[in-house]
Amino acid sequence: MALRNKLHSLPKADVHNHFHLSGAVELLKEHYPDVQFETPGSFDGFDGMMHFIIQHVNALMRSSDDVIMLMDIGIRSSINDNVKHLEASVDLGLTKYFDNSLEALINAVGQLKEKYRTEIDFRPEIGFKKSSELDEVYRDGIVCIESEVFTGIDLYGEESYQDL
């Protein structure tokens, strides 16, 4: 246990997580006391992971306030784990909870970045599905990078047996 505590106290970098999915279950239960799931030790591939996310996490998201709360829980979980540098992917699809406003999503992420700036070096990336239209990636990706809130682009999706 002493080694675990020592490792926990060391400063860390998390160079890739999916922001609204990265919160500790304990913090999640503080805000959503009816949550009745445990995170499995492993998933049955990408499809199994997506099934878990849709069934358990996405079910909590009904509004932009819920998305902001999940992102806030994610960043606080990182801070609690002594993460000093966080690169987190913010899925473009979350705009649907912000009345399809990319600007509103950018503003929400920017406010979290500012809120925690003295506690963590937070560098969000905008996440696009690999199946996104190239025009959308260029158009929205440029808006996000030029906002100076986002520092990169995360292109994600099933990678087995597919060209990148």
For every predicted segment, state its role:
Residues M1-L164:
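Metal-cofactor-binding active-site regions of metalloenzymes
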